Amino acid sequence: IRDRLLSKFMRQTYYQAIRGKYMLFDVLGRGISRKDITDKSATALFAERMAVLDPEHIEEYKAIIARLKDEQAADYKLKPLHTHYFRGDYTLHVRPGYTFDVRTVSTRTMRCEYGNGENLKTYFMSDGCTNIVTQGNEYTNIFPAWNWRRIPGTTAPQLDTIPMAASDWQTRGTSTFAGGVSDSIYGVSAYAYMDNYAGVNTGAKKAWFFFDNEVVCLGSGINSTSYAPVYTTINQCLLDDKNILLSQNKQQTTIKKGEFSYDSPDWVLHNGIGYIFPQGGRIFLCNQQQTGSWYDINHTESKEMQQREVFTLGFNHGTNPRNATYA
């Protein structure tokens, strides 16, 4: 039984959270604040050992090893999979073309930790954080330059100072409604977000519907009494060297460097991922260099300033929104 559990964990959980050789950032805990932490190529050794212990699935391990060693593309022999980990309020959706996950928190689970002087800006990561990756390296070492008020997937006020949870370890969530359903291939996740801690004073009803070639992200009941404008960030990832395309009123344009605001564009295309806005909305788009140091998020790391070219996209709900929505 223990051997079967180990096999299932390694094949259907651990390695599913790695795209190519890069692990999804929101399953790394406070390790996210350490340089090169997402590169898991060294875990090819684990897969080699599992191939000996679990010969029934040797072909799966061979494919995993090939991806980890860059001998094959990130999508090599990946099969559709959808899992909701109800004990952890976490959802993982895998397709050959992409991987997408959602992290939430409830009264049953704990917020992201920031112990030992690590992960010092992590506060909003527990609140509907998402990854969307095709190659796996879309967020590699972006974190010192990240705007941590705009973590992908989250709806959050753009506070001057990012809060720190009440405790560096084991701070329980406050939502009583966070969960999902899955048939192992498709699924739905939902999160009733409400946070009155440290001036956040913001709530939203958030849901994700998972299909083959698309993920539908919906938000409603977005309310806030915070002094700061509330943003729902769709993505904040490394900027691809190809053009960013935007369509508005069916007119396609190429986006230059800078910060921009649009009223109800049709869609945005960046790095092979399309973002469609069926209900419009006030959209912000940033396409520029961002700076920061590893020390800003981890006091054991270097104070040397880092520069990253970053793409950010999301909804601007304004200040004190009442029953705002997004799709």
Question: Language-model segments: which ranges?
Answer:
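Extended polysaccharide-engagement surfaces of secreted carbohydrate-active enzymes
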Residues: 3-326
